[in-house]
Amino acid sequence: TFGQAERASYDLAKDRVRLDGNAALRADDGAMLVAPRILYQRDNQKVIFPDGVELTQGMTRLVAPKGMVSLAVSDGPPEEIVLSGGVDVVTTVDATGALVEMWAKTVDSRRDPQGNWQVGARTDGPWITVRFTGGEDYFERTLHTLKMNAVIGPDGIISMQGDRGVCFQEIPFEGPPRSAEAETAQAWFSDGQLTDVELDGQVEVRAEQGVATGDRARLVQAGGLVMLQGDPTGRTRVGVESPRGRMSCDQATLYDREGRVEARGKVQGQLVDAQLLGASNTNLGGEPVRFAGETLEVIDKGEKFELRDNARVWQGHRLLVADDIRYDHSSQAVEARGHVRATFPAHEMDADASPDEDVVVVSRSLDYGGLVGRAVFRGSVHYSDPKHSLSANLLSIAFDDNDDISDVEAEGRVEIEDLEFGRRLTGQHALRDVESRTIRVTGSPAQLMDERGNIASGSSLTWNQADGTVSIDGGTELIYYPEEEPVAPGSPDDREESP
């Protein structure tokens, strides 16, 4: 170690050196320490800076009101550096020119066997602040914590950990700014530049108008995404909330730059300002749309949702179940694919129906347009309500301005059964008008079979449900089986049949 100063004094008895006036020490590894006054205790290999010190090594500079350096034996290079009183640190990342700035109340650094510095920072007042500026993908990233440990090598910071409470903010070149809070944080570096940050314990991440919570989160530099996980024991789940709604799941990935969210594992939640199959909009006093499934993808900043694997969506008395369900908020459109099952209130078809009774439609697919107020079911469609059942290739349900069912239209191998009186109507097309309480069936031909097996056919059948009559039009054909009156014992007819 080489030293210089304007004045120097040496205490032979105590083997100590004092340097005053622009004092400086240079170590063999290139570290430079500059201070107004330096006290060198050769007996215990310590250098004390009572009036402040500035330490420079490579691209790193540290400034503190007080400091102490412990040297290796025989006046070797520094092995430990303790700075206190409010420490400022500035490091330049050589590869990109990015800056790392830090403030802490106390900084304690020890050289490890690999030649790296194990740095610990503490504070009992203002939070420790580490600021990264000018990186590849971010204007600025800032870490606040009450306790910090880091490993610094010849090429810059290798890793960093925050403890006892952590706040993290970042402003990317692309995408919205975001912030996060947690109990602890672990940061990784490449060539001295911050890359990924992992947060642990009571995590909360905020971006634009949304907030996500979980037990653990990883903020990934590449792509600007956030990966959140819940507690494996199930005590804490991932939660995501925005003005569009909220949900919970086992794990989620937030793609802030794309405005997209992927959620997995027992996903459930609700949407506000949404409408399902003619149900009242929440702004009109209706209930929110609730959903559940194994996976969920949200795109276009919450405008579109895709729920997969045993998807369920419900609003009030309406329920939709399918393998996959897609929802577009702007058009209020719903698409369902695979094992579709939809449930509506039965009183929308029949005012006399009980509030607990349902209309159920089963099909392979469903397309619903909220703006046009029509739901179309396709593929092996089966419809049932308390008084009727229907099967067809296609079924279309229209909703009026009051969100009630106005008509039901069926196409392709239509079969309608009257569960009250045993009637069966078949044809190629059927239209049920709820207000007039009529069902019109057309086909080649359209047929009616009553409970006795009598058959009436024509080009069209109109069933008036109010009075129970059926009118037949166009090429009418009737097959009638008259009832035989029972034979009285001892009558002539009875004697003729007797042997």
Feature roles, as predicted:
Residues 1-499:
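Mature-chain termini and adjacent capping regions
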